[in-house]
């Protein structure tokens, strides 16, 4: 019975890791974990209870061995995105382990699982923490202030069990997961094959072409990627390369419907998972079959109404933050219900600003701009190809569009659609900054 995050690995019978042209069996993985455990306990003088470990690990194989070692020792673990510099999160008393950065008070992890203390590391300075959660995801702050978001083992295990059942994952299935493991989406879909006694391919790829070529020449049953990658596969005419997959998954943002349909036409079903770090997975869909989302079985809606557009409130055992169980957790998403288990996702309710005392929803501007391009110029832009922001009470709009836009004419036309104070002062046709998951990086834009 799996009851903690180490048991995800330890209780799985036929799990294996594919890495660097080698297949590691459970017995071989156990040996690596035991070696790292021994080195870690020796370095810390066996004083590890109530400690907190920050893992900043780039190599996927090292990452998983390190993670399961820390969970075997029952240590609260913080997963750090490799693009984040230590000064953003480092605090005295933590245990910081990295294979790609050096910090004077940290520990460097080598490929052979040696732990090398940096020049100012002192095991006596490691302090105890009140670790409320078993696992923390450090968010980089692409949509706000950087922070740790905690999860209990039960949150993760609930979701893994449901995903395994929902998608009928079998022993022997092989997963290739492109998103980084330190992101909740990448983490869950790296844990899913391990939870299911299947195989996770830990090889890394840096171009869409290399991913497609690898899948053509390897046994891969499930691909896990983000919308931007699926868009590139389409743009580069690579969709045929994925025809032998049993299935594919997408998350971290909406997948454009036309992309879903193009893959579906080649008998490739892309399952979109809708959720967040705080809530876990909430719903799923295959857009090409049905553009509406279906709630995952463990999710209950607290404010169902058959006709109104409203903010979605839910209860779920995958939610890790405190919330009123009677009222439900406010997701911040605006939906319209089809029935009690299906809904259309309309947008977010989190982007209101005031312009000269008047309140305006930036999402309203974005939606009208997208509709205008579609209706007037037959140009299709997805939600992830436009960003509307506000600085010093001036609205600005960024658009990623291959068609040349006449921004002067567009500004004139928008005056017929939007109130004067909501007209963007600047419309720029440009590449929009994104993070590793393909999400729009609002901090980079507004810097």
Regions found by a protein language model. Give the residues of each.
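Gly/Ser/Thr-rich phosphate-binding loop
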Residues: 222, 234-290
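Conserved AMP-binding/adenylate-forming core of the ANL superfamily
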Residues: 11-46, 151-154
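Conserved AMP-binding A3 loop
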Residues: 126, 133-161
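Conserved AMP-binding/adenylation subdomain of ANL enzymes
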Residues: 157-174, 182-222
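AMP-binding/adenylate-forming catalytic core of the ANL superfamily
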Residues: 334-422
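Conserved AMP-binding/adenylate-forming
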Residues: 39-83, 177-180, 359
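AMP-binding/adenylate-forming core of the ANL superfamily
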Residues: 300-328, 334-336, 398-400
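AMP-binding/adenylate-forming catalytic domain of the ANL superfamily
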Residues: 418-440
């Amino acid at each position: 019975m799996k009851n903690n995050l180490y048991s995800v690995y330890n209780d799985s019978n036929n799990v294996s890791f594919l890495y660097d042209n080698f297949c590691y069996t459970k017995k071989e993985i156990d040996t690596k974990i035991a070696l790292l455990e021994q080195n870690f306990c020796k370095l810390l003088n066996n004083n590890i209870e109530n400690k907190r470990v920050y893992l900043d690990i780039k190599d996927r194989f090292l990452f998983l061995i390190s993670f399961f070692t820390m969970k075997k020792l029952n240590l609260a673990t913080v997963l750090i995105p490799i693009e984040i510099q230590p000064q953003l999160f480092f605090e005295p008393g933590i245990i910081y382990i990295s294979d790609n950065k050096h910090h004077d008070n940290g520990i460097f992890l080598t490929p052979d699982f040696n732990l090398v203390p940096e020049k100012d590391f002192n095991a006596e300075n490691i302090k105890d923490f009140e670790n409320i959660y078993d696992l923390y995801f450090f968010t980089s702050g692409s949509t706000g202030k950087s922070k740790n978001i905690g999860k209990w083992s039960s949150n993760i295990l609930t979701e893994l069990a449901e995903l395994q059942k929902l998608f009928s994952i079998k022993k022997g299935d092989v997963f290739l997961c492109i998103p980084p493991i330190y992101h909740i989406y990448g983490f869950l879909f790296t844990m899913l094959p391990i939870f299911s006694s299947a195989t996770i391919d830990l090889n890394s790829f840096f171009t869409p072409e290399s991913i497609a070529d690898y899948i053509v020449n390897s046994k891969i049953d499930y691909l896990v990627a983000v919308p931007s990658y699926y868009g590139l596969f389409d743009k580069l005419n690579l969709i045929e390369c994925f025809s032998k997959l049993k299935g594919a998954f997408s998350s971290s943002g909406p997948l454009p419907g036309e992309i879903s349909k193009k893959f579906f036409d080649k008998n490739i079903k892309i399952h979109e998972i809708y959720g967040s770090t705080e809530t876990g997975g909430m719903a799923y869909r295959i857009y090409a079959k049905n553009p509406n989302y279906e709630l995952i079985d463990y999710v209950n809606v607290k404010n169902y109404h058959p006709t109104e557009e409203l903010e979605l409130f839910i209860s779920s055992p995958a939610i890790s933050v405190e919330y009123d169980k009677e009222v439900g957790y406010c997701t911040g998403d605006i939906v319209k219900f089809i029935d009690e288990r299906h809904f259309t996702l309309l947008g977010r309710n989190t982007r209101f600003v005031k312009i000269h005392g008047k309140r305006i929803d930036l999402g309203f501007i974005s939606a009208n701009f997208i509709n205008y391009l579609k209706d007037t110029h037959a140009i299709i832009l997805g939600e992830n190809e436009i960003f509307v922001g506000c600085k010093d009470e001036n609205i600005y709009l960024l658009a990623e569009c291959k068609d040349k836009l006449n921004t002067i004419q567009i500004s004139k036309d928008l005056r017929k659609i939007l109130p004067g104070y909501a007209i963007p002062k600047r419309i720029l046709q440009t590449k929009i900054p994104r993070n590793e998951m393909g999400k729009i990086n609002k901090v980079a834009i507004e810097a």
